[in-house]
């Protein structure tokens, strides 16, 4: 996604600063996901939130939105350090710091006029980038991803289904299914008119799901019908 938007590849490390790469991370003020979008900012960049789904926790959608936001900030401010500062505190605070510094446009020259958290934000990003870029030289070893992205694929869901039903009927650990589909807040994939929702599974389980989808959907419907209704009939 960074290549697509002509964003420096090093900015991938920003997600580590924001969320420690936890798709379901949520701050005390409500920022959510890998890229810690607030509800309003996420909505501006196409991330929908409803009772069942929070696109801010979808790694692919959130990363695409973050790239669009960073690109817009860079276009407005003309500098990647300033764009990073604006990502943290908003472009208004950066513009205010520029004015207070007498029109200077270098991050390090306006840093003292930024909010305290933002003053430490770019240094934190640079430190994180250094650690990961030069990890081998300093004896740090990475375990690699829990499940490689290229070892997964998606299925378009036709009927409402719970992740627990998928796990049970495809013989996958529920924690793994939830890990691959963090955007579903209640562990349920809904079916909504004019909306497309997908299920991500390990490639070797995609065929299992497709081959048995009628049975899986029927099982899910039966399970939903058995659930206690919130109001008396």
Regions found by a protein language model. Give the residues of each.
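Extracytoplasmic and endomembrane cell-envelope/extracellular-matrix remodeling and assembly machinery
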Residues: 4-5, 44, 49-52, 56-76, ...
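Short, surface-exposed glycine/acidic/tryptophan-bearing loops
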Residues: 25-46
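Glycine- and small hydrophobic-enriched segments that form the cores of compact globular domains
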Residues: 6-7, 11, 22-26, 33, ...
């Amino acid at each position: 996604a960074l290549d697509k938007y002509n964003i420096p590849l090093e900015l991938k490390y920003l997600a580590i600063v924001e969320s420690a790469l936890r798709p379901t991370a949520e701050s005390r003020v409500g920022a959510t996901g890998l890229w810690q979008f607030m509800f309003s900012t996420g909505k501006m960049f196409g991330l929908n939130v409803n009772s069942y789904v929070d696109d801010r926790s979808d790694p692919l959608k959130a990363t695409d939105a973050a790239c669009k936001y960073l690109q817009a900030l860079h276009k407005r401010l003309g500098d990647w350090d300033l764009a990073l500062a604006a990502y943290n505190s908003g472009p208004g605070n950066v513009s205010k710091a520029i004015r207070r510094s007498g029109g200077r446009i270098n991050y390090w020259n306006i840093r003292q006029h930024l909010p305290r958290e933002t003053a430490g934000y770019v240094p934190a990003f640079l430190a994180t980038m250094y650690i990961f870029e030069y990890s081998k030289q300093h004896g740090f070893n990475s375990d690699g991803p829990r499940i490689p992205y290229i070892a997964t694929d998606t299925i378009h869901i036709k009927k409402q289904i719970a992740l627990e039903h998928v796990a049970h009927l495809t013989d996958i650990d529920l924690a793994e299914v939830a890990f691959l589909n963090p955007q579903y807040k209640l562990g349920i994939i809904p079916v909504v008119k004019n909306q497309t929702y997908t299920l991500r599974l390990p490639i070797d389980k995609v065929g299992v799901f497709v081959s048995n989808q009628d049975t899986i959907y029927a099982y899910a419907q039966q399970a939903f019908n058995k659930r206690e209704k919130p109001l008396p009939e």
